[in-house]
């Protein structure tokens, strides 16, 4: 027999899903079925919570306590950059491996770096800004009309000033 279910126990489950879509509930079932939750209901809740991330692959953090699930979106750096580009949502099934060619401002990069700061391994904010610029480079967008790596070189040489915090 399985151990008795403790109502105060908090379980945390991380899931990768596409924003605004109900993922395959068959994929959810083995993860959250044993915790006493309905996969269909949780799938609908995730789709509702990720509505403004339509079409982007994001991580969702499910905190489950006493058979209630709290849903928290944990966006990746690339998802934040693509959202900042303000492109119309594309159909994932039709277009694969999209290169984004938009342009975002350095201020938006700094804001994204501040959001990602707690997850970054860099010691200072300037290091986190460089991490985000590297992600912008791999997404394929420009920053203030320039290639992101040129801005990284400017930060290293001191030509571009980074905010302290």
Curated annotation (Swiss-Prot):
UniProt modified residues of type Phosphoserine: 38, 165
Database matches in PROSITE patterns: RIBOSOMAL_L11
Signal peptide: none
Modified residues (N6-acetyllysine): 54
PTM description: Ubiquitinated at Lys-48 and Lys-83 by RNF14 and RNF25 in response to ribosome collisions (ribosome stalling).
SMART domains: RL11
UniProt KW keywords: Acetylation, Cytoplasm, Isopeptide bond, Phosphoprotein, Ribonucleoprotein, Ribosomal protein, RNA-binding, Ubl conjugation
GTP-binding listed as a keyword: no
Major location (coarse): cytoplasm
GO biological process terms, semicolon-separated: positive regulation of translational elongation; translation
PANTHER family listed in its UniProt record: 60S RIBOSOMAL PROTEIN L12, LARGE RIBOSOMAL SUBUNIT PROTEIN UL11
Function: Component of the large ribosomal subunit. The ribosome is a large ribonucleoprotein complex responsible for the synthesis of proteins in the cell. Binds directly to 26S ribosomal RNA.
Family: Belongs to the universal ribosomal protein uL11 family.
Annotated HAMAP family: Ribosomal_uL11
The name this protein goes by in its record: Large ribosomal subunit protein uL11
Organism the protein comes from: Rattus norvegicus
């Amino acid at each position: 027999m399985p151990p008795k279910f403790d109502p105060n126990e908090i379980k945390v489950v991380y899931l990768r899903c596409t924003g605004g879509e109900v993922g395959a509930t068959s994929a959810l079932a083995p993860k959250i079925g044993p915790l006493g939750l309905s996969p269909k209901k949780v799938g609908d809740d995730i789709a509702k919570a990720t509505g403004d991330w339509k079409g982007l692959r994001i991580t969702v953090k499910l905190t489950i306590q006493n058979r209630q699930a709290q849903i928290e979106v944990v966006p990746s750096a690339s998802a934040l950059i693509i959202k900042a580009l303000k492109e119309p949502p594309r159909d994932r099934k039709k277009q694969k491996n999209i290169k984004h060619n938009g342009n975002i401002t350095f201020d938006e990069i700094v804001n994204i770096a501040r959001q990602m700061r707690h997850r970054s391994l860099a010691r200072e904010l300037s290091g986190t800004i460089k991490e985000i610029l590297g992600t912008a480079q791999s997404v394929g967008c420009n920053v203030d009309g320039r290639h992101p790596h040129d801005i990284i070189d400017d930060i290293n040489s001191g030509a571009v000033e980074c905010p302290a915090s």
